[in-house]
Amino acid sequence: MKLKDTKSRPKQSSCGKFQTKGIKVVGKWKEVKIDPNMFADGQMDDLVCFEELTDYQLVSPAKNPSSLFSKEAPKRKAQAVSEEEEEEEGKSSSPKKKIKLKKSKNVATEGTSTQKEFEVKDPELEAQGDDMVCDDPEAGEMTSENLVQTAPKKKKNKGKKGLEPSQSTAAKVPKKAKTWIPEVHDQKADVSAWKDLFVPRPVLRALSFLGFSAPTPIQALTLAPAIRDKLDILGAAETGSGKTLAFAIPMIHAVLQWQKRNAAPPPSNTEAPPGETRTEAGAETRSPGKAEAESDALPDDTVIESEALPSDIAAEARAKTGGTVSDQALLFGDDDAGEGPSSLIREKPVPKQNENEEENLDKEQTGNLKQELDDKSATCKAYPKRPLLGLVLTPTRELAVQVKQHIDAVARFTGIKTAILVGGMSTQKQQRMLNRRPEIVVATPGRLWELIKEKHYHLRNLRQLRCLVVDEADRMVEKGHFAELSQLLEMLNDSQYNPKRQTLVFSATLTLVHQAPARILHKKHTKKMDKTAKLDLLMQKIGMRGKPKVIDLTRNEATVETLTETKIHCETDEKDFYLYYFLMQYPGRSLVFANSISCIKRLSGLLKVLDIMPLTLHACMHQKQRLRNLEQFARLEDCVLLATDVAARGLDIPKVQHVIHYQVPRTSEIYVHRSGRTARATNEGLSLMLIGPEDVINFKKIYKTLKKDEDIPLFPVQTKYMDVVKERIRLARQIEKSEYRNFQACLHNSWIEQAAAALEIELEEDMYKGGKADQQEERRRQKQMKVLKKELRHLLSQPLFTESQKTKYPTQSGKPPLLVSAPSKSESALSCLSKQKKKKTKKPKEPQPEQPQPSTSAN
């Protein structure tokens, strides 16, 4: 069996210089006799001969690193540890060896413990340079990394001295992952309010560092029944009320309880490799800084630690016991396959030993190997495999990333490992994350079901699942969405059913019932959906057995009290005017929602022409770009994000001031979740709807479902600025349309030309989109575009919000000059709306004494 090829292995050089991958040539290559009749057809006339090597030794890479690789090893980042320990053990007695240690750039890392693990401890074999071979893929990665780190440099750096261990460790600090969640500095808060809710002590410590002094209402009502009584929970609360911690803390408690019940005693063997003991004991022994650095990494930047898991060690033991010493020569990676003698170094001829001596040497080697493997098998038994204990299902990828980061922040002192499985990212990297056997997995249904079908060993047995969480459950179980979820729930409730499993279901619109469409109501045998019927249907789809505890903290309006709702009635073509007016008049962190991706792309091009650089977020974007745009939107104070309903649910973006519904959502649930991106955690926020003629029907449905007692107020717009706004939008539309058509035509024509060149055919002018443009027409179009852009640039250079003033003397244009009068920065959209409300409340009080006059005259 051959090791899995890894990135850390150096590539074979094209020169004729021989290289060794852990094999030392003792004898000579012997020619293999082949029957010449086998090559009678003449297809292998260039073949010279076949050679085989039977007399060789296994060389320890750690003993002679200079003879392993002839070229400079690739640089790798690692945590540095001093090499002085090896010198104290007497491994580097010669001064030449000490010089090599000083030259090495990367000092021995934590992975040196795993490197020592595979060295033969017999001094006789040690002198001969024999070594063991690891058959496990991940262990192979570890050893190859260590070999690369100890490889010497070709060039001598005379002026540079070796860094001390403290300096090297301080220089290499792990990079913090980018995220849109605000960083909370270590500030200890009083968490006495959490103690009555049966929160574990490590979680209390993390809550203190995060500054969460008191639980939110949904957390206070959920934690005790979920942790103490172990009840299934159906939780409904407003957006931004802390539902993530309401299900994260009970899940962490369930994992900790399982670890206590299945805790294994530490291994008695003091010489056990640190890489093995760290897998289980590391949950309690590693420092909080390491746990935080490990958990804060995004899926894209996650680096798998070089640790040998129990399952990996068992595979390694099976591989070693199954093969002899001679067979292990073939296990040194795929780079040696088919290369023959070119992969080895021909050293000085060594006198050939007798056959009896060779047999004795082989017996000693195999005996030492078996003894070491027996010790490892005992270590494997001491540490059982960690099953999957917690599973969180979310509808969107961004929400899954956010939930994982929240869980990692709360579980930073518990040692619990988490993993994320979402689409749009590398499947192989997520498989490596699952190889670490995390206790908690946060996933979207599609990628999770894909890995389950591939029968990953960590996802095979879901009967041991202790906690199942379905976030945004009403969206997850909607008909026509997430087909994989129904198959997954069916499997969990049938073949993988666990009666001890706890199910937690949360959403902001869990109990919100909207009216069904007319085409469904007119059908026979249709029942009106109410709150109880919706919950029963939800429980049936998820497979919850028994009576769960229902916690409903939503208002009748379903929105937050601190949210201010407003609207603007306009024509469809006028939506661009009011959107541009609002973004220019009230700058800040604004989130604009639309129902379609095409609308998002058109708005993005239009605003870019107007010197507003918006960020976009929709389903057709690459996942890395989606996460990058979210992070940038949370970092910039004055920024615009154009998004579809992908960003409507669950995202906790800090300090979003305005949510603008460019197109009215189709259902009331989407409206509640869109508006919930602002006014989070007792902060104020504004929700603005641009209502066109085609949006009136959806607006009335939302107004009726949310049971609004008062009419939504109109947003105040200063009409004196609209003429300038319309002129800018008119020019921007012409430029955007022309550029879009030209781009589409060039894209289509380029594809047609490439296809014709591949087929070797000639194209006709009719096949070009818009016809094949002449040079004169193209020059005329470009000249027209320059004129439009120059005119728009002139308008954009002038201030938009100005006030006219009277002058004593006539002007050249015959019009009064416009002087700049910028609005005060302290005046926000919320303050303008509140002023308008105060004016309306004062007006009806003035004409009250005049009302009884008509009644007296009638008498």
From Swiss-Prot:
Residues with the Phosphothreonine modification: T302
Superkingdom in the source lineage: Eukaryota
Acidic residues bias: start-end ranges: 125-139
Disulfide bridge positions per record: none
Free-text tissue specificity from the UniProt record: Ubiquitous. Most abundant in heart and brain, but with lowest levels in thymus and small intestine.
Catalytic activity: ATP + H2O = ADP + phosphate + H(+)
Motif (Q motif): 192-220
Positions of short motif DEAD box: 471-474
Domain Helicase ATP-binding: 224-528
Modified residues (Phosphoserine): S60, S82, S94, S287, S295
Modified positions (N6-acetyllysine) in chain numbering: K17, K71
Localization in the cell: Cytoplasm; Nucleus
Renumbered residue ranges of the record's region Disordered: 61-170, 262-300, 326-376, 799-859
Induction of its expression: By type I interferons.
Biased composition (Basic and acidic residues): 277-293
PROSITE patterns hit by this protein: DEAD_ATP_HELICASE (PS00039), HELICASE_ATP_BIND_1 (PS51192), HELICASE_CTER (PS51194), Q_MOTIF (PS51195)
Glycyl lysine isopeptide (Lys-Gly) (interchain with G-Cter in SUMO2) cross-link site: K370, K624, K808, K825
Compositionally biased residues, Polar residues: 106-115, 799-814, 823-833
Keyword Ligase among record annotations: no
Role according to the record: ATP-dependent RNA helicase that plays a role in various aspects of RNA metabolism including pre-mRNA splicing and is thereby involved in different biological processes such as cell cycle regulation or innate immunity. Plays an inhibitory role in TP53 transcriptional activity and subsequently in TP53 controlled cell growth arrest and senescence by inhibiting its EP300 mediated acetylation. Negatively regulates cytosolic RNA-mediated innate immune signaling at least in part by affecting RIPK1/IRF7 interactions. (Microbial infection) Plays a positive role in HIV-1 infection by promoting Rev-dependent nuclear export of viral RNAs and their packaging into virus particles.
Subunit: Interacts with FADD. Interacts with RIPK1; this interaction disrupts RLR signaling activation of IFN-dependent transcription factor IRF7. Interacts with NIP7. Interacts with EP300; this interaction prevents TP53 acetylation mediated by EP300.
This protein's name: ATP-dependent RNA helicase DDX24
UniProt organism field: Homo sapiens
Gene name of the encoded protein: DDX24
